[in-house]
Amino acid sequence: MLSLLSTPRLVPVIARLRGLSGCMSCLQRRYSLQPVPVKEIPNRYLGQPSPVTHPHLLRPGEVTPGLSQVEYALRRHKLMALVHKEAQGHSGTDHTVVVLSNPIHYMSNDIPYTFHQDNSFLYLCGFQEPDSILVLQSCSGKQLPSHKAMLFVPRRDPGRELWDGPRSGTDGAIALTGVDDAYPLEEFQHLLPKLRAETNMVWYDWMKPSHAQLHSDYMQPLTEAKATSKNKVRSVQHLIQHLRLIKSPAEIKRMQIAGKLTSEAFIETMFASKAPVDEAFLYAKFEFECRARGADILAYPPVVAGGNRSNTLHYVKNNQLIKDGEMVLLDGGCESSCYVSDITRTWPVNGRFTAPQAELYEAVLEIQKACLTLCSPGTSLENIYSMMLTLMGQKLKDLGIIKTSKESAFKAARKYCPHHVGHYLGMDVHDTPDMPRSLPLQPGMVITVEPGIYIPEGDTDAPEKFRGLGVRIEDDVVVTQDSPLILSADCPKEVNDIEQICSRTS
């Protein structure tokens, strides 16, 4: 899924990251944690799957599929280590991190959207109920990163649970997530006087609160009260995103699963695209194949763009017929166990590339393969983007689409590919959006590589045979110390492979 070339938030973020110089080692350092006390999970349905009620999804000790209480505790520990580093030189002897969950959002009266947890909240505790608060509080007499983790959760309510399903309650929240304590949500107000103290530095994202009501009830008054103190409320989001950049082995395994099942869904969708075909049918086929293989939801509304519509980068209407002889560009991904995939393929719906289609497709494929070889430690997405533009300028000249100097070819490349080469990937499609693309890549980072060439049918500068063609090829890549690990490697992209799949009989 494409993202914009730049964002105005980068300058302050880069400044903050300079203050964290050396903190990448914090992410890779070995930590010694006290064993997480094992607490018996209630033998009842909670507000989310548990090892007791869903043993086919979770093993004992896991909070979410594949991710244990120990992993979540380590994340909180690392976050408090970053808080400790950034707080040096500031007054305040106590530190409290506050992270809000998402609320339920409604599409119309009494009709909710499918609930999706705030990913920063989810990353730190794995709790998947709305209207909750996570608090990480430094321990008196102990140095950070020692802390106490607390959840404030909705109280169990038989009346509401009759309609909305079970809630975990405080006992379920503690046993499932492994936090130290849990309290009913309304008791958070009793913590506020301590947070207002001059000696307490509060870390909370007051500029973009994830839960408007909880912010208004609790955190906005606190933020305003501390605005004139020496210890103003400080943002924690950039620290959380700094952690989320580097995926653990368990996270990479979840992303491998998402990549594999999405690749299989692409294969089945390619096979089903017999011309003429409705974009809506391919949308439905792709979603079905993802869900049938275990995906929770699609990661985003997919682009299913036939013919000239592939030149609309975020085309999501998906309601037109794709004619015989046209290609379809499908940009789609799924979410599986909190982690997402993001893959794009372009293919002819009748199963055979025309000569101009194959010519343009092979050019994009060659650029994409060259960019994949650059996905190694020390380079950056910006470096790869610059290389993509250089290669694309040359390819556009080779194809006869442009006839200009080297400098003009670089400019033309931006015309025919107006988006970046990729973005970070993880729990979000456009993961860790405050992290600049100029950061050196490190082992454990996951990125997309997605060059494309788009030639609208009204572009009279291009040869007529290419007009109306749009091609993008996107893979998901784990940066390793050795060669890149392609999470979407099972998704065909060679011309011969695509044509064989589209022409198979069963």
From Swiss-Prot:
This is Xaa-Pro aminopeptidase 3. It catalyses: Release of any N-terminal amino acid, including proline, that is linked to proline, even from a dipeptide or tripeptide. Residues 1-31 form a transit peptide. Its cofactor is Mn(2+). Substrate binds at Y300, D331, D342, H423, H430, E450, E474. Mn(2+) 2 binds at D331, D342, E474. Catalyzes the removal of a penultimate prolyl residue from the N-termini of peptides, such as Leu-Pro-Ala. Also shows low activity towards peptides with Ala or Ser at the P1 position. Promotes TNFRSF1B-mediated phosphorylation of MAPK8/JNK1 and MAPK9/JNK2, suggesting a function as an adapter protein for TNFRSF1B; the effect is independent of XPNPEP3 peptidase activity. May inhibit apoptotic cell death induced via TNF-TNFRSF1B signaling. Residues 54-79 are annotated as: Interaction with TNFRSF1B. Binds 2 manganese ions per subunit. It is found in: Mitochondrion; Cytoplasm. The gene is Xpnpep3.
